[in-house]
Amino acid sequence: TVKTKDRSLSAQYEHTIVVTDNGCEILTLRKDDTIPAIISHNE
């Protein structure tokens, strides 16, 4: 956990994802996690 410039708290998290010819699977997904059907990517 870190503090931002305005002193708010912030945290970073990551998931391990495997990509195959048939799609992808999130290996680190916990039972209480929800993942959106579409993940937005902004360049």
From Swiss-Prot:
Swiss-Prot/TrEMBL catalytic activity: Release of N-terminal amino acids, preferentially methionine, from peptides and arylamides
The enzyme's E.C. designation: 3.4.11.18
Function in brief: Removes the N-terminal methionine from nascent proteins. The N-terminal methionine is often cleaved when the second residue in the primary sequence is small and uncharged (Met-Ala-, Cys, Gly, Pro, Ser, Thr, or Val). Requires deformylation of the N(alpha)-formylated initiator methionine before it can be hydrolyzed.
The protein's name: Methionine aminopeptidase
Designated gene of the protein: map
Source superkingdom: Bacteria
Top EC class for this record: hydrolase
One Gene Ontology molecular-function label: initiator methionyl aminopeptidase activity
